[in-house]
Amino acid sequence: MDLWDKGPKVLPAYTEGMSLLAITRQPLRAEALAADLERQVQSRGEGCGGICTFLGVVRATHQGRRVRYLEYEAFEPLALKSFARIESEVAREWPAAAIAIHHRIGRLEIGEASVVIAAAASHRAEAFQACRYAIERIKQIAPIWKHEFFDDGEAWVEGATADVDDEAARQRARDIAACA
């Protein structure tokens, strides 16, 4: 499917067999996504020695201000395209790794998950690094914006700022992932 033709639909809650790269308005299910990723890796005959998951959740405070809730917006066709780019970058950097990325949009309350990333690899180090790399690249290139609502006002948090093809940005993400 060409992501620029009418764009994909916002997906419902995660169900088994759903795309491993998704934008959804429904609650995220990290365990189900990780299990589906593991099944896909195993079905290809590849060994899976470790699965690492990252769950980003809405925190109660930001820079000393009490957060009431967040609203996420995304340019969905391009966000999914950026997830696919990240998936390709992970495959080049860690050939034995596979990833899944789901990001939520819409209104999220304190403690709700906004993003889940699962990374599977033949060894734990690669799974950790691929997972960390993916979240850093999402922050750099995915057109997803966060609108924070506080007790005393509201603010937009700057979204993606790096050029998708910026090697320096990719290197920063690799360096951060190496510390995972």
Where are these regions (language model features)?
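N-terminal, polar/charged subdomain of small-to-medium soluble alpha/beta proteins
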Residues: 14-114, 129-132, 136-180
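Short glycine-rich or small-residue beta-strand-to-loop segments that form or flank ligand, phosphate
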Residues: 114-121
